[in-house]
Every structure is written in C-alpha cells, then in structure tokens.
Regions:
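Acidic/histidine-enriched alpha-helical segments
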Residues: 110-124, 349-367, 504-507, 557-567, ...
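Amphipathic, well-packed alpha-helical segments that form the structural scaffold of globular domains
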Residues: 286, 290-293, 303-304, 334-342, ...
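Beta-lactam-recognizing serine transpeptidase/beta-lactamase-like catalytic domain environment
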Residues: 72, 78, 299-316, 325, ...
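Solvent-exposed, polar/charged alpha-helical surfaces in well-ordered, non-transmembrane soluble domains
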Residues: 93-101, 209, 213, 238-242, ...
Length: 728
C-alpha cells in the first residue's frame, strides 16, 4: 500500500470513530435523560399498574360458658359478592339479571332494602314500610333523602327517580323494580372499585357450586367465604347474649341537632356492610369480640389484567368472652322453672281464668356475685330469631322480654328481711323485742289492715315474724323504723338500684315519702313489700346474696374473663367487686337467717331437703281481680328469695312466677335448682340431661295447708283496705 492509500484509510477510520463516538454520546445522553431526569414518569408508563385494597373481615370471637363450651360462635358461610374492579366493561344490568335468575332458581334471596313492593296491575307502586314501625318510617325517610326527594314523594316518584338515574326505561316494570332495588342497595353499600357489593348472603352450597361453574362467563361475580353468628344451644340465655346485625343507616350516618354529620363507625374502622353487636353482651363486648380486619391487595395493569394479589395484612380473630354461667346448669334451671309453672297450673290454677304462664329465675354465687343462671319463661331460640321474629313479637307471653333483668315486680313479703335488717341494725328493735299480734293492726283510726295469724299469735319476735310472715309485726316495726331508713338499707342490699350487670337492667324503685300518692298507710304497706315498690329478679337474687354475706354486696356480673382466641390465655379476668357494705354490729344477720331457715321448714320441697336453706316467700298482689262468691280478691305472683347452705352460703337466688299464687309454691323449684347445682359441682350434670332431679315432697299433696296459709299474710286483700287511708 502506497502512502496516499494509507492516508485515505486513516481518514476513513477516523471518520467512523468520530461518527461512532457521536452516536454513543447521543445514546448515553438519552439514557441519562431516561434514567435520571425523567425516570419516574417513564417507569410508570412502562408498568402502569394500580393497587386496590379490599377488607378481609376478621372472624368474630366466641362466647363460651364457664366450662369452655361454645354458646355463640362464628361459622363459615358464603356470600355472593360483586367486584366492580373485576367486572371490567361488562353490562352491569345484564349481569344483575343473570345473577337474579340464578338465585331465584335456587330459592335464594338477595339484598334489597328498597321499601317498595311489586307494581300493581295499573303499573303503580306502594311503600311496604309499616305505618306503626318507627324503624321502617326512619328507613323510608332516609331512602327519600338519599335519592334527593322530598318527604312527600310517593312510591311512584321513587321508582321514577331510580329508573331515570340508572337508565332502566327499556326494562319491563318487574325488572325495573328488581334492578332499581339492587342499584339502591349498591348505593347504600357505596359500590365502587375499592368497595365490593354483597348481593346475597349465606347462600347454599348448591348455589356456590353453580356460580363457580359459571365463573368464566360471570367476571366479577365471586363467592366469598365469611362468618355467620350461630348458637350451639340457641335457647341458652338469649336475652343476655343479645344479637349481631348489619349496621343501620342511622348508626352509620349520624346528624346532630346542629345539622353536623359524622360517621363514627367508619372512624372506628367499620365498613357499611359490616356486622356489629346490636344488643346484650354482643354489643357491650363489641370491641373485644370484633377482631382486626385484614387487607388483601389486588394489582391491576393498565389493560385491566390482574397481575398480582397479596394478603398485605392478615386478619386477627376477636377475643373469646367467657361467661360465669355453666350451660348445663342454665339448662337445668330453665327446665325446672317450666316444670314448676306447669305444676302450679295443673295443681292450683286448673280452673282459674288466669294461668301461671311466665316467670324468671336468677341464681348467683354468693362468693363473688357471678351469675350462674338467668332464666326467662317463656323464652326464644337465637337461631330462629330472624325467621320467627313476627311470631315471637306477637306472642302474648312476651318471650322477647328479659324478665330476669328488666321485669318489674312488687316484692311482697320477700322485702320483710330488709326491714328486719334495718330495724335491728339501727336499734329500733333487738332480738328480744316483740310486737303483739291479734290479727288486726289498730294504730290508725279507720284503717285496720289484717294478719291471718297462722302459726303465731300474741307477742311476736323478729325470728317468728319472719318465719310466719307476720304482717302486724312488720307494719309496726316498719312504721317505727320509717321508710327513709329501711329504704336506705334496701338500696345497700341491691333493691331498687342497679346490680352492676354488664347488660341493660331495669332500676326499679322503692316507696318513698316523695311519692305523689304517699300516705302513712302507704308507708306501712311498703314495709311488707307492697306500695309503689317494684324490683327485678336479678335484684332479688343480689339481695338474697347480700343477706347471706352478712351485708356485703358484690357487683353482679355475667363475664368471667376475656381470653386470647388462639392461645386461650387469660387477657382480663373479672375480680370480685364490693358495691356496698352494711356493717354488722351484732347479731342482725344471724337473727334474719334464723327466721328464713324457719320459713324453709314450712315450705314443701325444702322442709326435708338435706341441705339447710334459708328462704323467704312472697305473694304480692296484682292489679287484676276475681271473685270468690261475693268477695273480690287480687291475683297474686309467686315470689321467693333463698340462699344455701344457710350457714355458709354458696348460691343465692330470686324467683318470680306471674299469677303463680302463694310464694311457697316455688319451694320445689328451689329444691330442683339446688339439686342441679350440686350435680354441676360433682360433674354429674350434663348439657343433655333433662335438668333437675327428684326432690322431697314433689307431689301436689306435699303442698300442705301450712304454706298455703302462710302465703295469705303476704298479700293485703281488698276487704281489709279502707275507703280512705290516713294522711302522712
């Protein structure tokens, strides 16, 4: 190669190198621009995915009895859920039609809270809200408000609005109503890309299988596993357990008197379609039972493809609430109460127009105030509440009424031990004090209340007065003690005041000098448990426990502990809490106990019982009357308080049987309860047993003349009441 050719090659190589250098420089600069200057923007364009977070509901904690048996639990169920995110561009109304047809074919229902029925023959609609239902009327008003309609809007106006808003004009009237109702429900549940719509709940396994089989042609229609509240024994303390239910519109959106709107449940982490405790222990312990929801994250690309799912927060189940009640003992007390009511009707009320048809029993531990049983008769089954609510609510026996905690009853002679404690402790009387009983109380001119004097007459001391329920003794001692004093003692023992139970209870009241109808005669009537005084069965049991504990009253309670659901570890345990104390300055409670032991010696079912029981009967009047010949008489309730063993009590109880008659008629019931208690202690009582066993004197003949006559002292009959009573 000559020199000229060599120069040409060198020049060409230099040019190529220069060109390559320029290209490399441009490429490097472009990389710098892409990666450093605008990297975030181009990365987003390259990936272009969106994350959507969905709530995974945590399992609700169980409620168990003192032995660990489940009473309320969360069981697996299946919901039909629509995901707007996964539905994509599908025709929503066509999809809804298909789902409805599938659900109808399997006998399922779907969520539809629109208070409008099907159109009539003329194509007009009517509201289904009940005129006398406050909740229905509130829901109707909220519906109109949410649709932007005036409150005078008709059902036709509402449907016209829904048809217009959701473009349903092309559908037949029936489908306009169906689809309009579903769209309204979607609106209520805030259906969106981040909030799924629960269309149907607790569907059958057949429905689940059918929807899964059609999943490829029904995008966004999913079966979601969830939990439903169920009750292993639906008739165990349903009134106390309470219920769970959907969050209502009123609770979700709260508007105060100034028009300020807040969403308190949303602020606590709830979704609008969540379940929540609405009454009883389910509501009181909502924060413990609820658990912590999880979060599932779904990632979708720009072209709508789901590219990833992850459980970003694992749900945590709620805590377990353990009760003080043993299910087997509770069942035994329930059956014993029903058996006693049946006995009263067959033996005493068979020809009466008023039957004993309702009652309540509360049994507590005297050691700490824990409730061992709280029975209502009649009652209901939690598992049937939703399907049989109409039947329950219209039942004249009022099975939905929590008589044990909210029933208010005149205590009758069960109140007399409280007056005795007040008189003894305040020094009005002592163990040697007597009142002369000749059958008529003559202190007031023109007012002569009577005493039947069965088993006693002459000078009566406090022990004898309690045993034979002497009205004259308590008229006089009550008058001298005054209602101000004996009421104060009664309050301390748990009467006319809250006992401390975790769920709603009635307060009751005692007769006071501030009552509008107060007279001196009312004061002495209050001393025998009549007048304006009304108490609850749980108060009677608490009061009996205070008598047994020589004046120490514990807070009455249903919850034993809060447990970790996964480990069973005790997180919180209820400790005995003293609510009040009467300082026993001598033999006050010993004397009252002796009198109450004397009562049990006269009562069928208790007089031969192997354990000494202290009790007091009561036969308070009801307002309804009947005639025996020309004599007008009042129907009466059966009342009883008891504790035992008398010298070192373990349990105390309060009993009410409406229209039961004499208080001593509950004697066999008390014996049955103690039988069940001792069977529970020795482990021989099981949940499947029929309850109480045989006790002494269980036949009708065992209810002899003695207790029947004693009962007559517990009520003031009309023939002893004056036309006018003396003023205070």
């Amino acid at each position: 190669m000559n020199q000229d050719e060599h120069k040409i090659v060198v020049r060409r190589m230099a040019g190529l190198i220069a060109a390559a250098s320029v290209l490399i420089a441009v490429y490097v600069l472009r990389l710098i621009f892409l990666q450093l200057v605008n990297s975030d923007s181009f990365k987003a364009q390259a990936t272009n995915t969106t994350d959507y977070n969905f709530t995974v509901t945590a399992a609700r904690g169980d409620i168990v009895d003192s032995a660990g048996r489940r009473i309320a639990a969360s069981t697996t169920s299946y919901n039909v859920v629509l995901s707007k995110l996964l539905m994509g561009d599908e025709d929503l109304d066509a999809m809804l039609q298909r789902i409805v047809e599938l659900l109808e074919a399997h006998g399922e229902k779907w969520n539809d809270s629109l208070l409008i029925g099907e159109p009539d023959a003329a194509g007009h609609y009517s509201f289904t809200a009940q005129a006398d239902s406050t909740s229905d009327q509130k829901a109707l008003a909220a519906m109109k408000d949410s649709l932007g309609l005036q409150q005078y809007a008709t059902a036709d106006d509402v449907m016209e609005k829904l048809v217009e808003d959701y473009k349903l004009e092309s559908y037949p009237l029936h489908w306009q109503r169906v689809l309009g109702g579903i769209h309204y429900e979607m609106q209520q549940q805030a259906f969106s890309n981040v909030n799924n719509f629960v269309m149907a709940e607790n569907v059958s396994e057949v429905t689940v299988a059918t929807i899964k089989e059609n999943s490829l042609t029904m995008p966004g229609v999913e079966i979601v596993e969830t939990s439903t509240r169920s009750y292993d024994e639906g008739d165990i303390i349903p009134h106390v357990l309470g219920r769970v239910g959907k969050i209502t519109a009123e609770k979700w959106k709260v508007t105060d008197e100034n028009g300020q709107t807040t969403y308190p449940l949303r602020e606590k982490g709830y979704n609008m379609n969540d379940m929540i405790g609405v009454s009883g222990l389910e509501a009181v312990y909502e924060d413990e039972l609820r658990g912590r929801d999880g979060v599932e994250t779904i990632t979708r690309s720009s072209d709508g493809v789901i590219v990833g799912t992850a459980m970003t927060t694992v749900p945590e189940p709620g805590h377990t609430v353990q009760l003080t009640i043993d299910s087997a003992f509770q069942q035994a007390v329930d059956k014993a109460l029903a058996k006693n009511i049946e006995m009263i009707n067959s033996t005493y009320n068979s020809s009466s127009s008023a039957k004993a048809a309702a009652g309540a029993v509360v049994v507590i531990s005297t050691k700490d105030g824990s409730v061992l049983a709280a029975s209502n008769y009649p009652s209901y089954d939690q598992n049937l509440f939703a399907t049989q609510y109409s039947q329950y609510s219209s039942d004249p026996g009022l099975p939905l009424l929590n008589r044990a905690l909210q029933g208010l009853y005149t205590p009758g002679s069960t109140f007399k031990p409280a007056v005795a404690v007040a008189a003894l402790d305040s020094g009005v009387i002592n163990r040697f004090s007597t009142v002369y009983c000749n059958g008529v109380y003559t202190y007031y001119d023109g007012y002569r209340p009577k005493c039947t004097r069965h088993g006693h007459s002459g000078n009566i001391d406090v022990i004898t007065a309690i045993k034979w329920s002497c009205n004259i003794f308590f008229y006089d001692v009550g008058r001298r003690t005054t209602s101000d004093v004996y009421d104060a003692y009664a309050y301390k023992m748990g009467l006319g005041t809250r006992t401390g139970v975790e769920v709603n209870e009635a307060t009751g009241r005692l007769t006071t000098k501030n009552d509008s109808n107060y007279t001196a005669s009312l004061d002495i009537q209050a001393a025998i448990g009549q007048g304006n005084t009304v108490v609850t069965p749980v108060q009677l049991a608490t009061y009996a426990g205070t008598l047994a504990n020589r004046g120490v009253r514990y807070r009455t309670h249903f919850v034993k502990a809060i447990l970790d659901t996964n480990t069973g570890k005790v997180l919180q345990e209820t400790q005995p809490e003293v609510m009040d104390v009467i300082e026993d300055r001598g033999d006050t409670f010993d004397l009252v106990r002796q009198g109450m032991i004397g009562v049990s010696e006269t009562v069928s079912g208790l007089k031969n019982y192997p354990v000494t029981i202290a009790c007091k009967t009561g036969t308070p009047q009801r307002s309804e009357t009947y005639y025996v010949g020309s004599t007008r008489k009042h129907y009466t309730n059966t009342m009883m308080i008891a504790y035992g063993p008398a010298e070192d009590a373990e349990i105390a109880l309060g009993i009410v049987i409406e229209y039961g008659g004499g208080g001593a008629r509950a004697g066999n019931l008390v014996a049955d309860i103690f039988d069940a208690y001792y069977a529970m202690k020795d482990g021989s009582l099981t949940l499947d047993e029929t309850g109480a066993g045989e006790t002494a004197d269980t036949t009708a003949d065992g209810e002899d003349a003695v207790p029947e006559t004693v009962e007559n002292n517990d009520a003031l009959t009309d023939d002893t009441a004056p036309a006018e009573q003396p003023a205070a």
